[in-house]
From Swiss-Prot:
Mg(2+) binds at H11, H70, E119. NCBIfam families: PRK04101.1. Disulfide bonds: none annotated. The gene is fosB. Its cofactor is Mg(2+). It comes from Bacillus licheniformis (strain ATCC 14580 / DSM 13 / JCM 2505 / CCUG 7422 / NBRC 12200 / NCIMB 9375 / NCTC 10341 / NRRL NRS-1264 / Gibson 46). GO terms for biological process: response to antibiotic. This is Metallothiol transferase FosB. Residues 8-123 form the VOC domain. HAMAP family: FosB. GO terms for cellular component: cytoplasm.
């Protein structure tokens, strides 16, 4: 293994206003498995991703709704109807997606009880790069970095 390299995402931590509400949301929506719960913190396993929550009741949360910042999880195209139904049945706040070209692939956007945004996306970075290279040649592409990314994921 090479030294001095980022190895991947270690964990995702969210500030939440009500720990018990967030625990219920992530268990029901994502089928996340809780590992440890305390008075103001909880750790979950989400299919190998370490999720952490810290309850912070007095944080202003209104501004988060104006941002496009989000976390996207990959899903299969054929699973899109399942997720649409599940989110609807659970009463999850599903957000209006942005207009997109079919080359961007399909997505569902939604938020948790504190306004953290998520996307369930059917494409990959490789799909997006191919679409951009074919349809948006005016963009700048770093061919060396793109090749290295492809090579790492063969």
């Amino acid at each position: 293994m090479e030294n001095n390299k980022i190895l991947g995402i270690n964990h995702l931590l969210f500030s939440v206003s009500d720990l018990s509400v967030s625990i219920s949301f992530y268990e029901k929506v994502f089928d996340a498995k809780w590992l440890v719960k305390a008075e103001k913190t909880a750790y979950f396993d989400l299919n190998g991703i370490w999720l952490a929550f810290n309850e912070e009741k007095d944080i202003k949360r209104q501004e988060i709704h104006d941002s496009y910042t989000h976390i996207a999880f990959s899903i299969q195209q054929e699973d899109l109807p399942f997720w649409e139904k599940k989110l609807h049945d659970l009463g999850v706040n599903v957000l209006k997606g942005r207009k997109r070209h079919e080359g961007d692939r399909d997505s569902i956007y939604f938020s948790d009880p504190d306004g953290h945004k998520f996307e369930l996306h059917t494409g990959s970075v490789f799909d997006r790069l191919q679409y951009y290279q074919n349809e948006k040649p005016h963009l700048s592409f770093h061919e060396g970095h793109i090749k290295a990314l492809y090579d790492r994921n063969k």
